[in-house]
Each structure stands twice: as structure tokens, then as C-alpha cells.
Amino acid sequence: LATGMVLVIITGKIDLSVGSVVALTGAIAAWAYNKTDGSMLSAVTIALFAGVVIGAVQGYWVAYLKVPAFIVTLGGMLGWRGLTYIFTDIQPIGLMDDGFKTITTGFVNPVFMDAKNFALLLGIVVVGLMLTSDWMRRQKRVKLGFDNLPLPLFALKNLFVAAVVMWVFYKFSMDRGVPIIICLIAVLVVAMTYVMNNTVFGRNVYAIGGNAKAAKLSGINAERTEFYVFVLMGVLAALAGVVFTAYMNQAQPAAGNMFELDAISAVFIGGASATGGVGTILGSIIGGLVMGVINNGMSLMSLGQEYQLVVKAVVLLVAVWYDLYNNKKSA
């Protein structure tokens, strides 16, 4: 959710409906899985298509009808949740078997080698790609005359990152291999990072968030870009709905409750600006990990739900305040 929410916030908008979209698309996925006799591909495709439709509806209202995103997605939060209750009759939809759960509990098991050895090989490949990419980025900055970390610090940073990544993959190799969900998240992060950093669409998103009027004057179709941002958010929310349904092994009418708060908090913790124009995919993932640690920590402390909500509210307020404080200080 955070990888899509960061795009919405970069454009200066917000999406309060993602939790309800998770619930509705998760219910659709469970229903489709049962109706197609356990066809995971059909269930996921139908759920993602529902996410496209939901995102397109909200995007049209925001981008072309010029209704504030806060109002549109607030209505979506209520409307999609209501449709979920109607669709499920306020009852969980159980899955016909455990096949769907493979998305969250399965492991990559290649036919050409042992899963544990594959985990180590994949770790080496990932580290190699990360180091190569960082070195090429550094060389490009040197060529353009930009400031860089001193070479010893650069090497130390990359050595630390490589050690952490290899440790993670080593732990995978000691278990049953690389979890499918980890591969899914990794592919999503890499794809979204590439889109934001190397495509016209990604640069347009940043331009609109930085100065929408200037972006329009420079020839950017702001309405179309904002529309696609909300469509993409709908697809990612649907993907989250599929994963959550697989994790729970059933679709719950109350699924996704307060997910929008966690996603928004993750984006701001990850460095996005409340005024738009600033934010990264990697930052939102780091913010999501921080929120996950906070949630797990509070659960381990047996902290009541009411206190957990207060803590999350404080975290969100502090993250936004810190961003505004930095902006004011730099100005």
C-alpha cells in the first residue's frame, strides 16, 4: 500500500479509501477463487481488475471533475466498505482449500536446483546488482561534478548493506528457501522505483507535486497523470487485498481497517513531504518496516488496541510536523 500511497502524496493528494478497497477486492478474490474451482490466476486477475475499476472511478472524480481527493476517497472509504458488507453479507468468505494461501506461505522451489542453494545464489545476484547499481550511480555523479561520499565511507556503507542482505538470504537458505511473498514485494519495489526514476510518468508525478501550474504550462497532462496515479493505487490496494485474504485464508468484511493510517504514516516516516513533490519508493518501504516494528512491538507488549491507536496517531503527527519544520527551516 505504501508504494502506491507515496505517489498519491507526491502529487499533493491523499487516499483514505485503501483499507476499504483491500476489504472489497479481498472478498472478490475469495469469491472468484471458489467460483472458479480454485483457479488462483482467475481470482487474482478478477481482483486486480476490480482494483483498476475502483481506482479509475476515484481518479476520474479527482482528476477530471476536480473534486478534492480528500472528499472523494473519504466517500470511497465509506462506499467501498458498505459494498463489502453487502457482497459478503457481513460474513467471512472461506476459501475452498489452502491453495490460495500459497501466496503468503509458499516458497520459491526452482526445478533446476535445490531451494536452499537457490536462496544463496539469489542473494549473491541481488548483492551484485545492488553494488553495481550504486557504483554506476556514484560514477555518474562524479562525472557531473556532484558531491559524493568519500570512497572509504562509500565502501563501508556498501559492505554493511551487502552483509545484511546476504545474512537475510542465508537465513532463508537455512529454512525452506525464499518466500514467494518476499519475491513479490521485491519485484514490486524494483518496478515502482524504476517507474518513478526512469520514466516520463514518474518525472511527471514529481513535477505535478512540486508545482502543478508550472507542470501544466510545460505541457504535462496533469489530469491524465493524476488519473493514472489513482488507478495504480487501486491496483496496488487490490494486490494487498489478495495477499491479506491469502494470509488469513478467508475474506473478512472488516479486513483493511485502519490500513490507510499505516500506509500514510509509512510514507511520511519514509521522508515524503506533506506539501507534495517529495518522496521515494524505498523511503516508503522503510517507513512501512518502521510501522511494522511499532505494531509488532506494541502487540508483544500486550498493549490494548485503544493505546495502539493513540501511539500511531502520535507517530503520524510527529512525522508530518518534522517534515513541515524542516521545510520551514530550509526556507
Predicted regions and their residues:
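Transmembrane alpha-helical segments in multi-pass inner-membrane proteins
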Residues: 55, 230-243, 247-313
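C-terminal transmembrane helix and the adjacent membrane-cytosol boundary/short C-terminal tail
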Residues: 128-140, 285-331
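Alpha-helical transmembrane segments within multi-pass membrane transporters and channels
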Residues: 37-77, 286-287, 291
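Transmembrane helix-bundle core of multi-pass membrane transporters
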Residues: 77-196, 253
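Loop-to-transmembrane alpha-helix initiation sites
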Residues: 69, 98-99, 113-123, 177-183, ...
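Single transmembrane alpha-helix segments in multi-pass membrane proteins
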Residues: 1-36, 60-70, 196, 214, ...
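Membrane-helix/interface signature in polytopic inner-membrane proteins
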Residues: 135-149, 190-230
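Hydrophobic alpha-helical transmembrane segments
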Residues: 20-24, 41-49, 71-74, 119-120, ...
